[in-house]
């Protein structure tokens, strides 16, 4: 079923995140997470004819939401290649970049993609359906220790070793091919009152590994730091502690580790100044309208 932009994904913190860009009407902007196009449309509504917006999405499904506007270019690519694409288009600097790091509702609600444990689906989880290992490949091929590390680091699950052991045992009986197969192998390890939360963390961990999300985020933020001109804004919405920590560290220190370097005179060398010292979160009305926004945090920084 073809979805409208409105049903593909509801934009989170729409006004707040675009306001955070401090739009210059003739500027060059990037939305690295196009999805349903909500944030891109809002940015375009504030631009003049001589401005331009480049929007990225690695999922070809998002192309159905492309905006017919001469000031708009859709790039069907992972945002980790931001710098390469800007070089391709002859863009040397940016006035602002927006990222909404949440998974589109389209992905959670599409039964064929394997992102949600609500459906019995092929265990896929690839944002880009044309490339890379599927979640099933990882679950069936990775060593037990590697699986345990994924569930511990990306899902923050304390029983990660037991989960990995259960999966390895299950796959010796038959390949784990669907979300139902996957859940059947690990469900006995979860307490009933925490089952949904822990299963969500497990699916999150596997999705992050499938799509190399942490590495891609670090590469994109590094490129953004280089491309943003002085006064340019970085507006990023995060949804879990792992990605939020990386964004926070880059904005405060200029690197994912949060290590502030000093110049010859002992002065801190940081590329950004924070626009909002406290994170911005959706108000009660937005959370009620869009429950998937509840964990969202918006951070905004300005290039020095």
Per-region residue spans from a language model:
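S-adenosyl-L-methionine-dependent methyltransferase catalytic core, i.e., the SAM/SAH-binding region
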Residues: 1-304
């Amino acid at each position: 079923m073809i979805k409208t932009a409105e049903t593909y994904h509801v934009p989170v913190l729409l006004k707040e995140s675009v306001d955070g860009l401090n739009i210059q009407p003739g500027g060059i902007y990037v939305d690295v997470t196009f999805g349903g196009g909500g944030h891109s449309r809002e940015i375009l509504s504030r631009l003049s004819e001589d401005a331009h917006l480049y929007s990225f999405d690695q999922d070809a499904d998002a192309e159905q939401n492309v905006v017919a506007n001469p000031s708009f270019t859709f790039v069907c690519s992972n945002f980790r290649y931001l710098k390469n694409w800007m070089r391709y288009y002859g863009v040397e600097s940016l006035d602002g970049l927006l990222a909404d790091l949440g998974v589109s509702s389209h992905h959670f609600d599409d039964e064929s993609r394997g992102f949600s444990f609500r459906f019995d689906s092929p265990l896929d989880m690839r944002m880009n359906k044309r490339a890379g290992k599927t979640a099933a490949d990882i679950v069936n091929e990775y060593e037990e220790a590697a699986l345990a590390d994924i569930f511990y680091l990306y899902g923050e699950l304390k029983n990660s070793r037991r989960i990995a052991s259960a999966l390895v045992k299950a796959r010796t009986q038959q390949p784990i091919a669907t979300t139902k197969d996957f859940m059947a192998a690990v469900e006995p390890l979860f307490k009933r009152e925490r089952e949904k939360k822990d299963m969500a963390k497990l699916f999150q961990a596997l999705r992050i590994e499938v799509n190399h999300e942490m590495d891609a985020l670090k590469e994109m933020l590094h490129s953004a730091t280089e491309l943003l001109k002085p006064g340019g804004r970085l507006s990023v919405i995060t949804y879990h502690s792992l990605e939020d920590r990386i964004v926070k560290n880059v904005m405060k220190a200029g690197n994912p580790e949060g290590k502030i370097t000093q110049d010859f005179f002992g002065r801190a060398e940081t590329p950004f100044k924070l626009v909002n010292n406290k994170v911005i979160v959706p108000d009660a009305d937005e959370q009620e309208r869009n429950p998937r926004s509840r964990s969202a945090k918006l951070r905004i920084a300005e290039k020095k």
